UniProtKB/Swiss-Prot annotation:
Homodimer. The keyword Oxidoreductase applies. One of its GO terms (biological process) is chorismate biosynthetic process. Belongs to the shikimate dehydrogenase family. Pathway: Metabolic intermediate biosynthesis; chorismate biosynthesis; chorismate from D-erythrose 4-phosphate and phosphoenolpyruvate: step 4/7. Gene3D superfamilies: Leucine Dehydrogenase, chain A, domain 1, NAD(P)-binding Rossmann-like Domain. The gene is aroE. NADP(+) binds at G132, G133, G134, G135, A136, V230, G253. Shikimate binds at S20, I21, S22, S67, N92, D107, Y232. It comes from Streptococcus mutans serotype c (strain ATCC 700610 / UA159). This is Shikimate dehydrogenase (NADP(+)). The lineage of its organism: Bacteria, Bacillati, Bacillota, Bacilli, Lactobacillales. It catalyses: shikimate + NADP(+) = 3-dehydroshikimate + NADPH + H(+).
Length: 289
């Protein structure tokens, strides 16, 4: 990678962020596509957020990725947000287009691109049951609604149920999607909804410890159920291990990470990311952990 006076910058902004795999993904893509760009990680306090966004235009950057805890906080400083970002209420990609800052959310797109690529799954006219109501879950729910899902069942913690219901109502009113919200503590209801679902998603952090899962070993799955977990470290959570032991298709969150990045890269550069090459490198890295 040759850095010169014409090199353009992209970055991921969050706190903490030094652990991010995004610089590896995007710098690999810049090098392989021959684009004169560099991608770095900026760990900044919220008090510096507005000036950081101004610097996108000041330095003629491609744009930036936004991670927690700033996905909502950046929205007032943007000139425009896309339909998906507006539905989700969060932005993960900002594009510098002709001096205007446009906010996108590529998380939901990345999730369903992963399912389509690795499991040949299309969410249109399908029934989904999803565990979780946070940022990743909301992105998946909104994208599923945009893509024409028939029914979406959301299970979230009782403490956040009213907030989740309000968000679901907003998404439903703007897309026409049928959405219901239930307490995640009600395992019997989860079982009931999963038995009539086409897709079952864990969008919580339960399983990151490599030991825990929300459902139990006696849980029943319908044949041909597609299963996904947004977690990618560990590479196989107890949840995924259980469903694979029953012979079901299942994917982890690494593909979502890659394809949300690929969508951002294409928005910035107009070039397609060499996703297959990068996937092989990521798989090697995380399978060994």
């Amino acid at each position: 990678m040759q850095i010169d006076g014409y090199t353009r910058l992209a970055a991921v902004v969050a706190t903490p962020i030094k652990h991010s795999i995004s610089p590896f993904i995007h710098n690999y893509a810049f090098e392989k596509t021959g684009i004169n760009g560099v991608y770095v990680a900026w760990d900044i306090p919220e008090s510096e957020l507005q000036v950081t966004l101004k610097n996108i235009m000041r330095y003629d950057m491609f744009g930036i990725n936004i991670s927690m805890p700033y996905k909502q906080a950046v929205i007032p400083y943007l000139d425009e947000v896309t339909k998906a970002a507006d539905l989700i209420g969060a932005v993960n990609t900002i594009v510098n287009r002709d001096g205007r800052l446009i906010g996108y959310n590529t998380d939901g797109f990345g999730f369903f691109k992963s399912l389509g690529t690795f499991a040949d799954f299309d969410v249109a006219d399908k029934v989904i049951t999803i565990l979780g109501g946070g940022g990743a879950a909301t992105a998946i729910i909104a994208q599923a609604a945009i893509n024409g899902a028939k029914k979406i069942n959301i299970f979230n913690q009782t403490a956040f149920l009213e907030e989740t219901k309000e968000k679901a109502k907003q998404i439903s009113s703007k897309t026409g999607a049928a959405i219901e919200v239930f307490p995640v503590e009600d395992l019997n209801m989860i079982q009931k909804k999963v038995l009539v679902s086409d897709l079952f998603v864990n969008a919580t952090n339960v399983g990151m410890d490599g030991k825990s899962m929300i459902i139990n070993d006696s849980f029943e799955f319908p044949p041909n159920l597609m299963v996904a977990d947004v977690i990618y470290q560990p590479f196989e959570t107890p949840f995924l291990r259980l469903v694979r032991s029953r012979g079901l298709k299942a994917v982890n969150g690494l593909g979502m990470l890659l394809f949300q990045a690929a969508a951002a890269f294409e928005l910035w550069t107009g070039k397609e990311m060499p996703s297959q090459e990068i996937w092989q490198a990521l798989e090697k890295k995380y399978k060994s952990k």
